[in-house]
Amino acid sequence: MKFGNFLLTYQPPELSQTEVMKRLVNLGKASEGCGFDTVWLLEHHFTEFGLLGNPYVAAAHLLGATETLNVGTAAIVLPTAHPVRQAEDVNLLDQMSKGRFRFGICRGLYDKDFRVFGTDMDNSRALMDCWYDLMKEGFNEGYIAADNEHIKFPKIQLNPSAYTQGGAPVYVVAESASTTEWAAERGLPMILSWIINTHEKKAQLDLYNEVATEHGYDVTKIDHCLSYITSVDHDSNRAKDICRNFLGHWYDSYVNATKIFDDSDQTKGYDFNKGQWRDFVLKGHKDTNRRIDYSYEINPVGTPEECIAIIQQDIDATGIDNICCGFEANGSEEEIIASMKLFQSDVMPYLKEKQ
């Protein structure tokens, strides 16, 4: 079993941005002592939904502040920045950490990011393909050249070279069937969303396994990750109550930050996300409290026994034994770390790989 901790860097109303950044560093350091293998950092821009615009920089700090902790991105919006610049950043982190960096990537969801950074969102899928292929070439060969409709430059040497053979491990944040297939065609592990239930996770893995097998990959050796919103307390109601205020503000901030729901009909390739939002509305999840209640049904929020049951059900259904939890909804920094420690002592030891 492996365990990760993802850090949202959401700015709740009661915290300043300086306090959020300080908490990010403290929680990252605390994760190493609480039995977590990896900390995952999210990329967001221009909104309190997430203050971390450059996870590479934050990863460098946390890798330097810890000794054994892996630090990953969940995820870099790959199409919005130059692939060579990003490949240099990844290799630098891989070298300086001696292989402790994890490179999580995604295609991107927010129209605002593409507009500000000057990337055509309609081309996001093609750019994702192109950028990844170029970066993979650089990681493997030490050189990159490009001559296609998206980018042109002569052969250059990628410095520094990768520390890890083939480059830092790559993960894909995957929600849609098309992204699942994209990852499977390349044998890349997925980070599965915390907003889907066990049945949906199993269906996503079945699709992945079918496509990956067709492309010659051994699916038993692919290190997928399950993600969760997590709160552990010996009092189940207290665990849920302490999270509700944070999650309410966080969900509302997400809706406000996301342009795709109200003006993305002209954007190609995002039908899954628009359909997902329609499903949320039909289920009543547009109402924040109902959405939080549903989140509690499918995420480990409650007593240690309740948390174990929810996670173990997903492990048994999917075979995934890499568990990534987010604890920031638990209140103050002290309360967050207390929940992390209780997860370490009363949940981690009792989770078992699928038999």
From Swiss-Prot:
Gene3D superfamilies: Luciferase-like domain. One of its GO terms (biological process) is bioluminescence. It catalyses: a long-chain fatty aldehyde + FMNH2 + O2 = a long-chain fatty acid + hnu + FMN + H2O + 2 H(+). It is an enzyme of class 1 (oxidoreductase). InterPro entries: Alkanal_monooxygenase (IPR033924), Bact_Lucif_Oxidored (IPR050766), Bacterial_luciferase_CS (IPR018235), Luciferase-like_dom (IPR011251), Luciferase-like_sf (IPR036661), Luciferase_bac/NFP (IPR002103). The synthesis of this protein is regulated by a complex control mechanism that has been termed autoinduction. In fully induced cells luciferase comprises up to 5% of the soluble protein. Coiled coil: none annotated. Keywords: Flavoprotein, FMN, Luminescence, Monooxygenase, Oxidoreductase, Photoprotein. This is Alkanal monooxygenase alpha chain. Heterodimer of an alpha and a beta chain. The keyword Endoplasmic reticulum does not apply. GO terms for molecular function: alkanal monooxygenase (FMN-linked) activity. CDD domains: Alkanal_monooxygenase.
